[in-house]
Amino acid sequence: MKSEPEAYGIDDLRREGTTLWDGIRNYQARNFMRSMAIGDQAFFYHSNCKPPGIIGLMEVEEIGLVDPTQFDPDAKYYDPKSNRDKPRWDCARLRFLGEFQQLLSLDQLRQQYSEDQLPVIKRGNRLSILPVPDATAADLLERLGPLH
């Protein structure tokens, strides 16, 4: 799950403990989020920064929540076409599990994995939520080492 550290970074999640992962306005990313289950782990990926990469780990606490920002005209992610009776956009509640000792950069990820193993490395990929195959996730966790 990608976020720009200036908008919401791993330090924000550490401080808050949990967060609503809201503001998803792409149907494919929304559908990936809908496929998550309570207890799933998610990598926290800092994007649009130098260097971008995997920095932390989160756990899914709640799923299928209605994204409140879609109804708020003052919110950045307001969607005037969204309807309270049939909302378009969901969010999930995520819990901070920890930060890795070192960020695993996009360049390092590209050297170690294929696009099939890790879709986030595909050039031009703008989705903020992407699945990671189980075997790749296990390998990443081993490479990244313990959380702190």
Regions picked out by a protein language model, each given a short descriptive name:
Residues 1, 58-61, 133:
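GIY-YIG nuclease signature motif recognition
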